[in-house]
Amino acid sequence: MARAAGTTIDCVALQSLHQHSAPILDADAVRLLHGEKSEQLAQHLKFTDDIASRTSAAITDSLKQLQPVTKIVGSKAKVDRVAANRRVPQPDGSIAVRASVTREAAVRDAPEGLIDPWLRTLTFFDGDRKLVQLHYYATHPQTFYGDARVSWDSVGIARGRMEKSSGVFQIYFTGCGGNVTMGKYNDGNRESRELMATRLLDAMQRSSSADADSIANTVDVASLKPSNIQWDSAPIEFTVREEGTFNPELLKTQLDPDQPFTTRLTAAMFSGFGQRLRDGYIAQATRLRIGNIDVVNLPGEPFVEFQLFAQQVAVKDSFICVAGYGECGVWYYGPDSIFTDRGGYEQTWSLTGPCQQKVEEALTTLLVRETLPKQEIRSK
């Protein structure tokens, strides 16, 4: 992708939708499960290469069709009854889990909890003509899954309908939805999928309209200086977990062929990413700045707290859009308190130790407006 765009790999941000009804790409886990010379790995790598090739070809073609941009508008609208926090505090101090489908009434009917209720939209214009719209919203994007069919789910349905009705190319990004689901309002059936899609589409339309809930920012491209357009990155050094279910020796025993496949699969994913960290892998957070618009791209499944932190640390007149689900090998990460909570789900699939300070430092570094420290940031 970087070669096709004529840039370097640190200037590429690749985010996933995370809708669950889709393949997981994890070559390290496949190697551990099936071996280096296995047909499964060969097919896995072939599929990955095909995705990379088709995406790169599309990038090459797009460079032949560049169009001028005269202004960029940042707007937002509140989403009605879609998202709710997955971690539901209980009277005894424990944390209950409100999954994407929740049958237990007391958990399902609890208050929404901490979310970011706003869907944010970036609209790129050539004169009065809309060229493309990017939408950002923080929730797990699935209503139901596991029936062996690939689906773009409710968010994809909303995006597709928005594109059809507007005639404008639409892109949807999942924000920091690690601890946010549709479980309060979703019954896990086709009717609920349709309802969630309808509510998301309504927010997209309101955010895109002239009477949007909030026209937050307009960038006049002609007034920009070269220094007003920046791409920067900051490292997030996730740490290996080796306690409890993440113990390397325990994971080795769980990879035994006699173990149930789901046990082996989990052990392979845990072991594969843990080894990547031991080998020195460092994840990156990136930020595109165009005038007073900042677009942040984060790895893994970040908690909504980090999206809200980004909005707080940015200067007052900035319009902030945050996309999660970049490098997803780390799975979940959130406030350090999740590691001492009683109950909850996300920390059982967090492949990093406490990292709140590191993530907040990366966001602060990317979102300040002063001169950026050269050892941490590379501007392109």
What are these regions (language model features)?
Residues M1-K380:
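Non-catalytic substrate/cofactor recognition surfaces at enzyme active-site rims
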